[in-house]
């Protein structure tokens, strides 16, 4: 069993590519869908993610995992891997960054997390409760890896939903551009400064919600 596989790969990428950060590019690809969860009184309580990993990462992650039926992996079979991966993602803030009325918000540790395996791909499901549930007229959420070791792309169908939100709330998703020109400029700057700590920000998926 690979303990904290995703976290270990992230650390290896960040540390191993430290001298080559000007050439940052993704090594893991995730197709994401998310839900912003509201309480009956209109309070935002958290974010529910479903992250489907690329086939190559999924295959590698499952190497050495024995099951009763070859090629079939139940939630129970995948539970240890789900737990260790969720724990390892803590230091990366779960790649989820929220602001309400412009003020940064913090998340508690994930709940209701599990892995499932369908059609050759692993999907990690997790819910991030807000440390302080709140009502906000303006809520901004970004999902990305600052080091750009992981590329997040939101699904074409139902990429983001509001669950239990007041009917008048308006949701927008701004997908990242390819960032080619910006990346080249930033690469040149990073080559001089050696800083690539927030390279992935230009590839962030930006979600905004406005409620009256």
Where are these regions (language model features)?
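Structured domain cores in non-transmembrane regions
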Residues: 56-134
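Positively charged n-region of N-terminal signal peptides that target proteins for export
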Residues: 1-4
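Mature, soluble, non-transmembrane domains
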Residues: 101-212
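Bacterial N-terminal signal peptides
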Residues: 7-16
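Early extracytoplasmic/domain-onset interaction patches
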Residues: 26-53, 57-59
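Short solvent-exposed loop/turn micro-motifs enriched in small/polar/acidic residues
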Residues: 29-30, 90, 108, 202
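Sec/Tat signal peptide C-region and signal peptidase I cleavage site
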Residues: 18-24
């Amino acid at each position: 069993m690979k303990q904290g596989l995703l976290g270990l790969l992230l650390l290896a990428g960040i540390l191993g590519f430290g001298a080559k950060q000007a050439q940052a590019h993704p090594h893991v690809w995730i197709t994401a869908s998310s839900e912003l969860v509201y309480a009956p009184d209109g309070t935002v309580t958290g974010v529910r993610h479903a992250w489907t990993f690329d086939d190559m990462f999924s295959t590698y992650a499952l190497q050495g995992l024995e099951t009763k039926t070859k090629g079939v992996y139940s939630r129970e079979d995948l539970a240890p891997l789900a737990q260790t991966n969720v724990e390892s993602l803590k230091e990366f803030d779960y790649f989820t960054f929220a602001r309400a009325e412009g003020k940064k918000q913090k998340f508690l540790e994930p709940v209701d997390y599990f892995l499932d395996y369908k059609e050759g791909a692993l999907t990690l499901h997790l819910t991030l409760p807000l440390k302080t549930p709140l009502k906000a007229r303006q809520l901004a959420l970004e999902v990305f890896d600052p080091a750009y070791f992981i590329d997040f792309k939101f699904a074409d169908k139902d990429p983001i939903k509001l669950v239990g939100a007041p009917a008048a709330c308006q949701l927008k998703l701004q997908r990242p551009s390819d960032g080619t020109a910006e990346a080249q400029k930033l690469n040149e700057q990073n080559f001089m400064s050696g800083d690539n700590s927030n390279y992935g920000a230009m590839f962030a998926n930006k979600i905004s919600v406005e409620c009256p």
